[in-house]
Regions:
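PAPS-dependent sulfotransferase catalytic core
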Residues: 1-56
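Generic detection of long, well-ordered alpha-helical segments
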Residues: 6-9, 108, 137, 141, ...
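Short catalytic/ligand-binding loop motif for oxyanion handling, primarily in non-cytosolic enzymes
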Residues: 7-13, 33-34, 85-90, 137-141, ...
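Amphipathic alpha-helical segments that form well-ordered structural scaffolds
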Residues: 11, 15, 19, 117-121, ...
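Secondary-structure transition/hinge residues
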Residues: 20, 24, 122, 152-155, ...
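Secondary-structure transition/capping residues
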Residues: 23, 27, 98-99, 158, ...
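PAPS-dependent sulfotransferase catalytic domain
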Residues: 60-158, 171-182
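PAPS-dependent sulfotransferases, especially Golgi type II membrane carbohydrate sulfotransferases
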Residues: 92, 149, 153-214
Length: 214
């Protein structure tokens, strides 16, 4: 599993462990290790926003990536994404809360590169499954069934859901509805929203299933 911070990776992992306790996840302890779920694979390392994620590794193709993983390479790569606006507003709050260094680029450019790299890899393998966070919230059964089928796990008739997410505060119904109703859009002015759209790679967004930044 891979995804940028604030994309819903913890939520997905929690659901998987509840429903498939034997499922294992590739997630190294160090944030600059290729096995870490937030590892920055994109080639332009100058936009890495937080020093703990700094790395110089260049893995231009999926074969190079799996060669770096070696025997740790999993059977399936689940890539979790949030819609660009939802991700950006959450990421911006997170960067301020954790006192990240100021950057000279728009954060959405990292979104473009992170998911753009996985989009590129997806042209070279069938081992990658892209999952939208909102789909995970609205229809977790369908998502887990799809994952289970790809991993040859038994498909469950009904899944166990959760409000408690590892490494996160209690996930309330209000937070869920705010996300589904896109309440976060009110955090950006029209100027800020247009600035985001100007920097957003619409090809990457469309590939992930988001149109007009959604």
């Amino acid at each position: 599993m891979y995804g940028l911070q604030r994309s819903g990776t913890n939520y997905f992992e929690t659901l998987m462990h509840l429903n498939y306790p034997d499922a294992t996840f590739l997630n190294g302890d160090l944030r600059n290790e290729i096995t870490h779920k937030h590892f920055r694979l994109y080639p332009d390392k100058s936009i890495i926003p937080e020093p703990q994620f700094d790395n110089t590794l260049q893995v231009p193709d999926f074969a190079d990536f799996e060669q770096q993983l070696g025997t740790a390479a999993p059977d399936l790569y689940v890539i979790i994404s949030k819609d660009p606006i939802g991700w950006y507003t959450s990421y911006l709050r997170w960067s301020k809360k954790n006192n990240w260094p100021k950057v000279n680029h728009h954060y959405i450019e990292e979104y473009n590169m992170f998911y753009g790299m996985w989009m590129h890899y997806a042209t070279q393998t069938h081992k990658i499954l892209f999952v939208q966070y909102k789909t995970l919230l609205k229809n977790p059964d369908a998502v887990l069934q799809k994952v289970a089928a790809k991993l040859h796990y038994p498909v469950r008739d009904a899944i166990t859901n959760t409000r408690k997410v590892y490494a996160s505060k209690r996930f309330t119904d209000k937070k869920k509805q705010d996300t589904l109703n896109e309440a976060y859009r009110s955090e950006l002015s029209e100027v800020e929203l247009q600035d985001l759209y100007q920097h957003l790679n619409t090809e990457v967004a469309a590939f992930l299933g988001y149109t007009s930044g959604r």
